[in-house]
Amino acid sequence: MYDATFSLPGHTMIEHSLWVPLDRFGALSRFAGDETAAIPEKIELFAREYVRHGNKKLPRLVYFQGGPGFGGPRMAPIGSWLDTALNHYRVVLLDERGTGRSHPIEAQAVSAVGPTPVQAAFISCFRQDSIAADAEDLRLAFGGEPWAVLGQSFGGFVVTACLSQAPQGLSEAFITAGLPSVEGHADDVYRLTYAQTDVRNREFFARYPGDEPVAWSVAKHLADVEERLPTGERLTPGRFRQIGICLGRSYGLEQLHFLLEDPFWTVRGARRLRPQFLDRIGAQVSLAPAPLYGVMHEAIYAQASTGATAWSADRIRGEFPQFRLPDVAAGAAAESELEAEG
């Protein structure tokens, strides 16, 4: 393991790098060697450790980020939960494989490994079971003392994988809002998600009734007028609807309200979306910081006992007519039809 140590006000920061196997569970073993020649046997795992001055002898706690697809938090200055945790632990912020500095994954890298079946097998090497195995290798590299684990959201799925695969390495386990089922199908998760999303939509428009006509105006405009995000992609009505992810957050109603502020202006007599509005929406819907989120989010709910998820989120949406999508070819007229349905 390679370490680099830095002195910060009140803290020592240590950056750890460790080489670990890519394919821990044989996902690539069914392919011939020449089919996987572009795939490395090992990848570099990165973690950043913080130690408060005077607390060098405290036990370690490793933090697993939510997602999937997001790296460990980069905090400057140190605050929030980390500030409190450092009074009790040396805290290790792990970049889970495929994120941050731990062999980050993006579309070009996946395309380069081979044909679609190889790509799918490659992506499967970045699940929570492999992340838990990486963490165990890191713990052993630190000397093997049991440590505490803390998982937020998807990080809780990693914690349960650690409890299953290497309980001997754990002194404590903390989970915040991420406890997976051991037998339920992804369909069950998405039925609950759509039902709760409907509730949150109603809460939002009850609190901010003026935002409902604004949202419909934007959707209808996007159905007929080409608008581009700062990154160059076209903003479609379907992608605009993805800002509803805010509704899953504690203060999401306010965040969504702020996103919808003052979307339009007039340019040479034409009604267009403001650049500032497009920038806010682009930042909200972009998966550029965490491309694995879009690819693997449904897969984290998979169970060996229930089989493939089979595009569960899309299938289950069909059970909820309030989330029916309009006919894209019909343009704004289809959006108006949906609006009239209430």
Language-model regions, residue ranges each:
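Gly/Pro-rich cap/lid or specificity-loop segments adjacent to the active site
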Residues: 2, 7-232, 340
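Alpha/beta-hydrolase fold active-site neighborhood
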Residues: 226-342
